[in-house]
């Protein structure tokens, strides 16, 4: 059964689809896409259930969400294995994804109270009360790279705020979505509060364009996000939250511990096979002996990165990319950089036909006069050698994106200089730029989003403020306004 609508599982009425383990091509899930009629039924179910869910109150909603957390805890091994099978990521990494999903419950409850709770103040005009109310029915579009954690980061705060949800996962990770929704079902969520529709572009279009949606929360490619933004233009009454990745820079300046710096570069560029929106795509290293030494150590370390299937022993650092098509896309991206004058220090290789397994790549693009401003979503790092710190920052800012950026530098003064000038929503110092705290906002500027930061600030786009001035009874003021007479 592929779709979950109004508390019931349904077979899709569209065409057959399947998902496979990208490391070996094994089919691990089959189903049928949702038709426009089924999408409509899911939205109708969400609309019907939404007010009763809201009127339960926060404490009752939280109790059910905490029951979901218990389900995640009880099923974390199965969920981690399912994510690993369907995405190709190593199991050590998917275990951390499930842990983040579990942690999201407490963080979201805290964010609800701190960002969108209730506040009362006595004023001369009366009692001023600030409350927050849910938007209504929202769609959540999930990505394939974190098929559990990222949609979970929208769904949990949306439900806590009192919204109902229609969830459309990536067509590449339907099995993970099905398991997630099964755990929500076991948590006692009322029918219609969370609905699941699986499918490809047509299903997504039917949901995104549905007139009864009050909002849409999206994590994915810049191209799709920009199309959604255009589609929602002229609809100011609908909330749209977009997270669309980045062409993220990492600058190295004056670092004594080269080994530690190389480690942070590897974690920034190659974790998740480079399939994190915060991954470093561009690396800026000083010219000179120290920079030469760092590059030499980096080349050696990149060549030694272990790549393999999700369940390989000993465990690899990098698993498979999401698909063979994604792997071929990275080979093509590398070829383009080389054609522009890039020099391969470590060549990215497609390791096995029919799979998404690739080795990591490192390309020196210092001689390339105009780098393509593209998010190469895979383990391909572009190296630029620089002679001037201001030049490095200027080059780092030459992108339409603005998600994450970082600097590895022993000098705090260098960091503060960089922090004041770099344009990004996540800026790290002496830490991998793929590291972000769930207790902080997560989002970027420029083409990386639309100023709707998620993580701790997801509460902000899940509810709207309602300001009230109140009194327990109607009463006359001590003095009437000029020109008024009441007899």
Swiss-Prot record:
NCBIfam families: arg_catab_astD (TIGR03240), PRK09457.1 (NF006992). It comes from the Bacteria. Catalyzes the NAD-dependent reduction of succinylglutamate semialdehyde into succinylglutamate. Belongs to the aldehyde dehydrogenase family. AstD subfamily. The active site is at 243, 277. This is N-succinylglutamate 5-semialdehyde dehydrogenase. It comes from Shewanella oneidensis (strain ATCC 700550 / JCM 31522 / CIP 106686 / LMG 19005 / NCIMB 14063 / MR-1). Its EC number is 1.2.1.71. One of its GO terms (biological process) is arginine catabolic process to succinate. Residues 1-23 are annotated as: Disordered. Signal peptide: none annotated. NAD(+) binds at residues 220-225. It is an enzyme of class 1 (oxidoreductase). Keywords: Arginine metabolism, NAD, Oxidoreductase. GO terms for molecular function: succinylglutamate-semialdehyde dehydrogenase activity. Pathway: Amino-acid degradation; L-arginine degradation via AST pathway; L-glutamate and succinate from L-arginine: step 4/5. It catalyses: N-succinyl-L-glutamate 5-semialdehyde + NAD(+) + H2O = N-succinyl-L-glutamate + NADH + 2 H(+).
């Amino acid at each position: 059964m592929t779709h979950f609508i109004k508390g019931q599982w349904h077979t899709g009425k569209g065409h057959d689809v399947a998902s496979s383990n990208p490391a070996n091509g094994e089919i691990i899930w089959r189903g049928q896409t949702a038709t426009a009629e089924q999408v409509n039924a899911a939205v109708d179910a969400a609309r019907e259930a939404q007010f009763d869910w809201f009127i339960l109150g926060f404490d009752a909603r939280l109790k059910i969400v905490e029951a979901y957390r218990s389900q995640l805890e009880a099923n974390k091994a199965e969920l981690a294995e399912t994510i690993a099978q369907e995405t190709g990521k190593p199991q050590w990494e998917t275990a951390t994804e499930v842990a983040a999903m579990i942690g999201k419950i407490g963080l979201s409850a805290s964010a609800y109270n701190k960002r969108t709770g209730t506040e009362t103040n006595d004023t001369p005009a009366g009692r001023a009360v600030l409350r927050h109310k849910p938007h209504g029915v929202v769609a959540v579009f999930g990505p394939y790279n974190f098929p559990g954690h990222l949609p979970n980061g929208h769904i949990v705060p949306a439900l806590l705020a009192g919204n109902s949800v229609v969830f459309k996962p990536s067509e590449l990770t339907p099995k993970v979505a099905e398991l997630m929704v099964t755990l929500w079902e076991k948590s006692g969520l009322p029918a219609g509060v969370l609905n699941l529709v699986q499918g490809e572009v047509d299903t997504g279009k039917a949901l995104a364009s549905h007139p009864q949606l009050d909002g849409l929360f999206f994590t994915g490619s810049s191209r799709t996000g920009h199309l959604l933004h255009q589609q929602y233009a002229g609809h100011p009454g609908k909330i749209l939250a977009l997270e669309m990745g980045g062409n993220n820079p990492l600058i190295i300046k004056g670092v004594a511990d080269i080994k530690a710096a190389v480690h942070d570069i590897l974690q920034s560029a190659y974790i998740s096979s480079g399939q994190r929106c915060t991954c470093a795509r561009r690396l800026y290293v000083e010219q000179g002996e120290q920079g030469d030494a760092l590059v030499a150590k980096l080349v050696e370390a990149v060549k030694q990165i272990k790549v393999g299937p999700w369940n390989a022993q000993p465990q690899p650092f990098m698993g498979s990319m999401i698909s063979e098509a994604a792997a071929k896309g990275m080979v093509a991206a590398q070829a383009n950089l080389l054609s522009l004058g890039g020099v391969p220090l470590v060549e990215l290789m497609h390791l096995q036909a029919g799979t998404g397994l690739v080795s990591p790549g490192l390309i020196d693009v210092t001689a390339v006069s105009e780098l393509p401003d593209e998010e190469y979503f895979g383990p391909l790092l572009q190296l630029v050698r620089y002679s001037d710190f201001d030049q490095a920052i200027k080059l780092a800012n030459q992108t339409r994106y603005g998600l994450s950026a970082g600097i590895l530098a022993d000098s705090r003064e260098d960091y503060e200089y960089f922090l004041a000038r770099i344009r990004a929503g996540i800026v790290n110092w002496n830490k991998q730029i793929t590291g972000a705290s769930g207790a902080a906002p997560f989002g970027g500027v420029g083409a990386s989003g639309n100023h709707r930061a998620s993580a701790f600030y997801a509460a902000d786009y899940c509810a709207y403020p309602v300001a009230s001035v109140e009194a327990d009874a109607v009463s006359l003021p001590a003095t009437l306004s000029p020109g008024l007479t009441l007899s």
